[in-house]
């Protein structure tokens, strides 16, 4: 599994085209562009053009160097004299896109995540758990080989907001071969990852999964031939409801070089997984170029991914799309500058609430890939989603117009309407969503079990609904955006003749309504 290089080489069989000294010059230009020294790259390109006026590859490299320097008009002028191949046309279109997006930047705030989480190597494929208690990355621990070695690292949050020094996961998760591009199930019991050059592999790189038994991960298990082929499979992303696995591959049928696919997941009695119904996401997402690094948000609707298509600024840019109720994906939208640049930008993911994103990009001195945190404007955020913890693990509830969400861990003492302290963390998250989404109003509906009279339970359920609403108001949400209802025991969701059933029936339900027309 090789991470993506800063630009597309026009001529692949370069050894057959150049003498040794020219190969060395090419590599020097390539290195200068990769490391951000585009001034020197431009100088060397011009020198070679004077020597070899009939060789278009130097002019193509010069056009790329101008693109990365930010001189888009010079790049277009340089490229316009070349034969208009697919790659030349794409690079010229990249210049037009880059010029437009840099002149109209989006409201992003980009922050380096520090030297503890980032290592001195290339840091790629960031992953944050839904509970935000572990940050995983893939680290290129040896990029001097023709096939760089990658391992999975992790870091923990500290009270001061920083992260602990990143450490490699132990064996058998990491080996002397390649492991990386990790994705975790919502309950934390499954990890998907990519391994390359394995004895049980089907091709160069395959998708694997591990199961967590207590505090120990099993050895990685190949996902099987339904997903993995003789080709390249990588960058898995599992949906929050554990029903679908998104991934990138160059397997057939494909639209372009690398496409994004999705497969259904089944869980067997012993916990092992099966996969079926592998589908290409189609040309709303995939192009004739490369699409990779999918990240499906917990809302189940919003997909982020990277592409080096004509709509990018050059290299890989992050795009997003949303699926409708009929299963159709919207046309992709470039996430804009400064999240995207003329360099490679990939491995994008978000936190649960969708107000922060994480991305791997070249650092400012051009030395290596590092992880950045990005504050996201509302226009590119996923749908508001809550993480609900219970004794069965983590579940996600998408906030949908008029659909009720029950939080079974909003707790009260028996026969009391005062909130327990342990209930407030969930309500804090709900209040945050309402503060960020001013078009959302909410109905707060109290429910009780059947113990007690009808009138008593109606009154108690109303008091509990009001108590919840008052707490949300105390967090800054306007009281005018809330309505309260007490349903008593009239709408049970479980039998009232057992303790377990009565616990389920004592609940607070939220129904959200958008004020947008």
Predicted regions and their residues:
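Short, conserved micro-motifs composed of acidic
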Residues: 23, 58-61, 68, 72-401, ...
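Bacterial Sec-dependent N-terminal signal peptides
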Residues: 1-22
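Periplasmic OmpA-like peptidoglycan-binding domain that tethers envelope proteins to the cell wall
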Residues: 307, 445-517
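Short, solvent-exposed beta-strand/turn patches at coil↔beta or beta↔helix junctions
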Residues: 399-438, 448-456
């Amino acid at each position: 599994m090789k991470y993506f290089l800063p630009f597309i080489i026009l001529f692949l069989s370069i050894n057959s085209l150049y003498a040794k000294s020219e190969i060395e010059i090419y590599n020097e230009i390539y290195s200068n562009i990769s490391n951000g020294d585009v001034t020197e790259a431009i100088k060397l390109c011009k020198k070679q053009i004077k020597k070899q006026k009939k060789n278009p590859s130097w002019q193509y490299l010069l056009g790329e160097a101008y693109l990365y320097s930010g001189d888009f008009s010079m790049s277009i002028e340089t490229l316009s004299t070349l034969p208009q191949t697919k790659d030349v046309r794409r690079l010229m279109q990249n210049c037009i896109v880059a010029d437009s997006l840099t002149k109209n930047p989006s409201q992003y705030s980009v922050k380096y995540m520090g030297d503890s989480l980032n290592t001195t190597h290339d840091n790629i494929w960031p992953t944050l758990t839904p509970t935000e208690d572990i940050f995983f990355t893939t680290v290129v621990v040896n990029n001097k080989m023709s096939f760089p070695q990658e391992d999975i690292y992790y870091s923990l949050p500290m009270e001061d907001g920083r992260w602990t020094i990143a450490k490699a996961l132990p064996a058998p998760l990491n080996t002397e071969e390649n492991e990386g591009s990790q994705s975790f199930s919502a309950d934390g019991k499954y990890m998907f990852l990519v391994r390359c050059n394995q004895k049980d592999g089907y091709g160069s790189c395959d998708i694997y999964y591990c199961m967590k038994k207590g505090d120990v991960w099993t050895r990685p298990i190949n996902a099987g031939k339904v997903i993995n082929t003789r080709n390249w499979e990588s960058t898995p992303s599992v949906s929050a409801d554990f029903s679908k696995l998104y991934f990138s591959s160059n397997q057939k049928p494909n639209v372009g070089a690398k496409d994004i696919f999705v497969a259904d997941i089944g869980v067997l009695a012993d916990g092992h997984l099966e996969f079926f119904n592998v589908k290409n996401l189609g040309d709303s997402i995939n192009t004739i170029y490369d699409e990779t690094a999918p990240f499906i948000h917990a809302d189940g609707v919003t997909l982020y991914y990277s592409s080096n298509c004509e709509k990018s600024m050059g290299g890989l840019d992050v795009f997003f799309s949303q699926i409708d109720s009929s299963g159709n994906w919207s046309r992709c939208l470039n996430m804009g500058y400064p999240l995207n640049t003329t360099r490679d930008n990939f491995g994008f993911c978000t936190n649960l609430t969708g107000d922060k994103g994480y991305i791997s990009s070249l650092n400012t001195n051009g030395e290596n890939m590092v992880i950045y945190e990005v504050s996201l404007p509302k226009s590119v955020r996923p749908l508001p989603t809550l993480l609900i913890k219970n004794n069965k693990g983590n579940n996600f509830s998408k906030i949908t117009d008029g659909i009720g969400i029950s939080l079974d861990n909003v707790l009260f003492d028996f026969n009391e309407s005062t909130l327990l302290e342990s209930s407030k963390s969930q309500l804090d998250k709900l209040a945050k969503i309402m503060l960020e989404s001013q078009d959302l109003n909410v109905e707060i509906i109290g429910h009780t079990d059947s113990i007690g009279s009808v009138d008593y339970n109606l009154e108690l359920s109303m008091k509990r609904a009001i108590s919840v609403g008052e707490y949300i108001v105390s967090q800054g949400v306007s009281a005018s955006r809330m309505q309260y209802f007490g349903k008593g025991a009239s709408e049970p969701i479980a039998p009232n003749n057992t303790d377990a059933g009565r616990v389920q029936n004592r609940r607070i339900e939220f129904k959200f309504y958008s004020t947008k027309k």
